[in-house]
Curated annotation (Swiss-Prot):
Domain of life, source organism: Bacteria
Sequence similarity: Belongs to the UPF0045 family.
InterPro entries cross-referenced by the UniProt entry: MTH1187/YkoF-like, Thiamine_BP, UPF0045_domain
Protein name per its UniProtKB record: UPF0045 protein sll0230
Gene3D superfamilies in the cross-refs: 3.30.70.930
Length: 121
């Protein structure tokens, strides 16, 4: 499939050389049509993330996840599949995610960086 995509083609060909890309995701999965209590659905997604071997931290309105791009997004899909399997007819999810290529950085390092700024201010 060769198309003249101009600048985009250059970007795509550059990133094909990247072997792996880590990502940090903030994921919020909300099942619809299941009532107001969603704990069992959140628990199902947490199990999926644990079984995937991904580092994740649940918080009040979602879950932070870190790992290889393909593994993380495969787990997000598996979360949706698990929640649908529990009977949720519809799901809405929101994600914020970031990558960086200048150096590796974990969720813990990001938090520690801010804590250090707070301690020194």
């Amino acid at each position: 499939m060769c198309q003249n995509l101009g600048k985009f083609e250059i970007v795509v060909s550059h990133y094909r050389r990247v072997k792996a890309m880590n990502v940090i995701v903030d994921l919020c999965v909300v099942p619809l049509g299941v009532g107001v209590s969603v704990g069992q659905y959140v628990a199902a997604c947490q199990k999926v993330l644990a079984e995937a071997g991904l580092k994740h931290t649940m918080h009040a309105y979602g879950t932070n996840i870190e790992g290889d791009w393909d593994e993380v997004f495969a787990a997000v899909k598996a979360c949706h599949e698990a929640v649908h399997a529990l009977g949720a007819p519809r799901i809405t999810s929101s994600m914020r995610f970031g990558t960086r290529t200048d150096r590796p950085q974990t969720m813990d390092e990001k938090v520690k960086s801010v804590e250090t700024w707070l301690e020194n201010s």
